[in-house]
Curated annotation (Swiss-Prot):
The chain crosses the membrane at residues 684-704. Potential calcium-dependent cell-adhesion protein. May be involved in the establishment and maintenance of specific neuronal connections in the brain. This is Protocadherin alpha-C1. The keyword Transport does not apply. Residues 922-936 have a biased composition (Basic and acidic residues). It is found in: Cell membrane. The lineage of its organism: Eukaryota, Metazoa, Chordata, Craniata, Vertebrata. Keywords: Calcium, Cell adhesion, Cell membrane, Glycoprotein, Membrane, Repeat, Signal, Transmembrane, Transmembrane helix. It is a single-pass type I membrane protein. GO terms for biological process: cell adhesion; homophilic cell adhesion via plasma membrane adhesion molecules; nervous system development. InterPro entries: Cadherin-like_dom (IPR002126), Cadherin-like_sf (IPR015919), Cadherin_C (IPR032455), Cadherin_CBD (IPR031904), Cadherin_CS (IPR020894), Cadherin_N (IPR013164), Protocadherin/Cadherin-CA (IPR050174).
Length: 963
């Protein structure tokens, strides 16, 4: 509460200058900091003097509700004061403080009156009120209600009470001896518990404050019952009929009377009234609680009407009672039940039977008399049936509506025949009516159109799906067979692609589907039942072929021509990002299976080129350096995004040149590393070549020196011409040599030449020839003769030696099928060659000799052996052709070696060396260098079975690229 203005009630000063008393007033709950009065002004002291005179403010209360603001000299509120808490029930609430000043000493009393505010609402200490008022009280009765309390004083206290509206009660104020008032509840209208047992009222107390406050209490009035109602029967007269033979204890009926009173006033007991004749009282028994009326003795002869009275009385202090009449008619005993006799019964009934069709005809009879012999016939069934009386005691069971076997195949018809006796007797007969099936339902497919998804590349006979039609008919009428209708699809007929199993509806494929050729089609399947006449329905099936990743990407550009590598020319001044070419490819698949990406799988210089992964543009990744090789090869792989992915590749040749050459170089050689690596290889080749020439010169000089110094050397053998030394030598001084071996060895790629080396060892006492492989006697003679060694068979020793050389066979072999003659292989090969591929040994008609394969024109001869071009070579490309047999072979001398050794399958070196067992070693190395000549490819169509090929000079090469 905020009090802004403070009234000074009284101000005086007593005891002269030594003492004084000040009084102030302030409303309760005033907020902190509000000024109550100005002490400085009231004491006639400046505000500064209060501090200088050691001003002290003393209080007897625990809490300091008020204080002095020294700068202004005001008396201010420190804590809000609650009058109800400080003074409780006191009429006046005053707080006293002492004010002490020194120099001179002064003592002042301060009295602060805390004024009441309306901050409390009226409150009923007892809470809600509950009153029990009997319903027999008359109007005017008074009932005291509790007072409300309000902690406020004066006009803020309670001034008035009020009551919620009620037609039975009003509020009045009563006075006590001391003059205080209290509220009273006055009964205005009599209460009736049976109408309303509880009344709810609200008592409100309101004070006189501004604004006014109020408090409520709920007054619950419970009406106490009194026995003011008599029991009432449901009926005033109860009538019944009882057979004369009813046994004792038979319940005739149950009576019931209701009393609206409460408790014992509403509890009812039953008994026979005193108004009942004495001779009838022993024939009936009434149960006092349930009100059942039972037979206690024989009721007498038939057709007798007995009259009795039943009394119902409550258990109140003054019990109230009421009576009801009982009329009991004794009737004849109905001891015969009706009888049913069926004359005709049709079962089963076809479901297409027309309404009015007679199912059964029967008669009824009862041997009782009068009403006991009158029979009433009824029927109970869930089916469309009707029971009709034909004539006297004859009934017909008819069809009253359509039958549907698919919904209900069997009905239970209950026929009841009851007489009119009391109680009536009846006979029940249940007839089972079966409904025979008729073909009245057409096969039904769940959907008129269905979709079928089939993955391509399925195997013939694979199951694709199943069609199913429902026919609710029975037996053959519901047995559906399926047939493929070949009337809808365009293009190939559906019957050529599919088959439908007639009994199960299973759809199988006759062929394998290809998404790229056939993406989908539609067809119809007919479902026909076995009824007479049959019914049918069709379903349209849309078959969709689902794509699989079964097609490799096809590169459209660039394409190799005649098996050569496509070449692009890039100026050496090209900047970074220069477009070299664009690889164009397509994929016959669809979706992600046809989404292609490009990347470089191999390149002569991986840092020189880059390719766009999405569009396939091959561009330079950096500037062309002077050290970059002129010829660059790039392998671009095109890969789709299927699962698993498929890919294709193309090899591109890139010529780094500022001008267009008249003749494009060959890009089919070995992969060359670019940049600094190529220059290093060039220096290495030059160094190796120099060292090789120096070594061979020294070796040749050493061999010649040894030959001249050999003691067993004749002039003829030592003075051979250079041509003789080049191809071989004849040994005459010793019939047996220490060892003779024939090795086929490859050399490093030094230049575009072949190296043939023959090494012979002399002067050994071990007369044996060492060969690798297995030979017969004829082969050994041919071998000895072929290498120019006149040795007897006894001087030849066969020894198997582990190594990479294979056995020598007499038959020629075809070239290696995996060999590709590229430009890179014209310089040499890093491989080992089988001995048997170096030459063919055969015994001619003139004696043992050796026929070496030579490069010759491929003129076909009837008895000549011919070696076809290597695998991978083109038809018109240069190839190796070998001729074997007696077709004009070039005979070699016994001491000569052929001038050229041609090895089918791979270029190689044939070396013939003899190794003595002693430390004396004589070696003669013969080195020849022959240039290979490259020729252009020539195409020539074949007519007939065989054609002749043009002769080529030198060693021929192929133009297939090694990818």
């Amino acid at each position: 509460m905020v009090g802004c203005g403070v009234a000074v009630l009284c101000l005086w000063v007593s005891c002269g200058a030594a003492a004084g008393q000040l009084e102030y007033s302030v409303p309760e709950e005033t907020e902190r900091g509000v000024a109550v009065g100005n002490l400085s002004a009231d004491l006639r002291l400046p505000a500064a003097a209060m501090s200088s005179r050691n001003f002290r403010f003393l209080s007897s209360h625990r809490e300091l509700y008020f204080g002095v603001d020294l700068p202004s000299g005001n008396l201010v509120v420190r804590e809000p004061a609650d009058r109800e808490q400080l003074c409780r029930a006191k009429a006046a609430c005053v707080l006293t403080y002492d004010l002490v000043l020194e120099d001179p000493l002064e003592l002042h009393k301060i009295r602060i009156h805390v004024l009441d505010t309306n901050d409390n609402s009226p409150l009923f200490p007892a809470g809600d009120v509950q009153l029990h008022i009997p319903e027999f009280l008359t109007p005017g009765a008074r009932f005291t209600l509790p007072n409300a309390q309000d902690d406020d004083e004066g006009s803020n206290g309670i001034l008035s009470y009020s009551l919620s509206p009620s037609q039975h009660f009003r509020l009045d104020m009563g006075s006590r001896v001391d003059g205080s008032e209290y509220p009273e509840l006055v009964l205005e209208k009599a209460l009736d518990r049976e109408q309303r047992a509880t009344h709810l009222l609200v008592l409100t107390a309101r004070d006189g404050g501004l604004p006014a406050r109020s408090g409520d209490a709920q007054v619950t009035i419970i009406v106490v019952d009194t026995n003011d109602n008599a029991p009432v029967f449901e009926r005033s007269v109860y009538r019944t009929k009882v057979p004369e033979t009813a046994p004792n204890g038979t319940v005739l009926f149950r009576v019931q009377a209701l009393d609206p009173d409460e408790g014992s006033n509403g509890e009812v007991q039953y008994s026979l009234s005193n108004s009942t004749q004495a001779e009838l009282r022993h024939r009936f028994h009434v149960h006092p609680k349930s009100g059942e009326v039972q037979v206690a003795a024989s009721l007498g002869p038939p057709e007798t009407l007995l009259e009795a009275y039943i009394e119902a009385r409550d258990e109140g202090v003054f019990g109230l009672a009421s009576t009801a009449k009982l009329l009991v008619e004794v009737t004849d005993v109905n001891d015969h039940a009706p009888e049913l006799d069926f004359l005709t019964l049709s079962n089963p009934v076809p479901e297409d039977a027309a309404p009015g069709t007679v199912i059964a005809l029967f008669s009824v009879k009862d041997e009782d008399l009068d009403s006991n012999g009158r029979v009433i016939c009824g029927m109970s069934s869930a089916g469309p049936f009707q029971l009709t009386a034909s004539f006297d005691n004859y009934y017909s069971l008819l069809i009253d509506g359509p039958l549907d076997r698919e919904q209900i195949s069997e009905y239970q018809v209950l026929i009841t025949a009851s007489d009119s006796g009391s109680p009536p007797l009846s006979t029940r007969r249940t007839i089972t009516v079966s409904v025979a099936d008729v073909n009245d339902n057409t096969p039904n497919f769940p959907q008129p159109q269905q979709e079928l998804f089939v993955a391509e590349n399925n195997g013939p006979g694979a199951s694709l799906g199943r069609v199913f039609a429902q026919d609710p008919d029975l037996g053959k009428n519901g047995l559906v067979s399926y047939e493929l209708l070949d009337v809808i699809s365009e293009g190939p007929s559906a019957s050529s692609l599919l088959a439908v199993e007639s009994s199960s509806g299973a759809i199988t494929a006759k062929t394998s589907f290809d998404f790229e050729q056939l993406r989908g089609f539609h067809f119809q399947v007919e479902g026909r039942d076995g009824g007479i006449p049959p019914r049918s329905a069709t379903v349209t099936i849309n078959l969709f072929v689902v794509d699989r990743n079964d097609n490799y990407p096809v590169i459209l550009f660039p394409l190799p021509r005649n098996g050569s590598v496509p070449v692009e020319i890039v100026p050496r001044s090209a900047r970074t990002g220069h477009l070299v070419t664009k690889v164009v490819a397509e994929d016959a698949d669809s979706g992600s299976n046809a989404w292609l990406s490009y990347h470089i799988s191999r390149a002569s210089d991986s840092s020189l080129f880059r390719i766009s992964a999405n569009i396939g543009e091959l561009r330079t990744a950096r500037l062309v350096l002077p050290t970059d090789a002129v010829k660059q090869r790039v392998v671009v792989v095109v890969r789709d995004h299927g699962d698993p992915p498929l890919s294709s590749s193309v090899t591109l040749g890139v010529l780094l040149s500022n001008s267009v050459p008249q003749l494009l170089p060959d890009f089919e050689d070995v992969w060359e590393p670019g940049g600094q690596l190529s220059a290093q290889n060039l220096y290495l080749v030059i160094a190796l070549a120099c060292i090789s020439f120096l070594f061979l010169g020294c070796l040749l000089f050493f061999v010649c020196t040894k030959l001249h110094q050999s003691p067993g050397c004749c002039a003829q053998s030592c003075c051979r011409s250079t041509e003789d030394l080049r191809y071989g030598s004849k040994m005459v001084s010793n019939p047996c040599m220490t060892s003779a071996t024939i090795d086929v060895t490859t050399v490093e790629r030094l230049s575009q030449t072949y190296l043939y080396r023959a090494s012979l060892g002399l002067g050994s006492d071990n007369n044996s020839l060492l060969l690798r492989g297995e030979y017969n006697a004829a082969d050994l003679r041919n071998l000895a003769t072929g290498v120019g060694l006149n040795l007897p068979i006894s001087c030849i020793q066969i020894r198997n030696r582990k190594g990479d050389h294979a056995n020598v066979n007499a038959m020629p072999r075809q070239p290696n099928p995996d060999w590709r003659y590229s430009a890179s292989l014209r310089a040499g090969m890093h491989s080992s060659v089988h001995l048997e591929e170096a030459g063919i040994l055969r015994a001619g008609p003139g004696g043992p000799d050796q026929q070496w394969p030579t490069v010759s024109s491929a003129t076909p001869e009837p008895e000549a052996g011919e070696v076809s071009p290597p695998v991978g070579a083109g038809v018109n490309s240069n190839s190796w052709t070998f001729k074997y047999g007696p077709g004009n072979p070039k005979q070699s001398g016994p001491g000569e070696l052929p001038d050229k050794f041609i090895i089918p399958g791979s270029p190689a070196i044939i070396s013939i060396r003899q190794e003595p067992t002693n430390s004396q070693i004589d070696k003669s190395d013969f080195i020849t260098f022959g240039k290979k000549e490259e020729t252009k490819k020539k195409k020539k169509k074949k007519k007939g079975n065989k054609t002749q090929e043009k002769k080529e000079k030198g060693n021929s090469t192929t133009d297939n690229s090694d990818q």
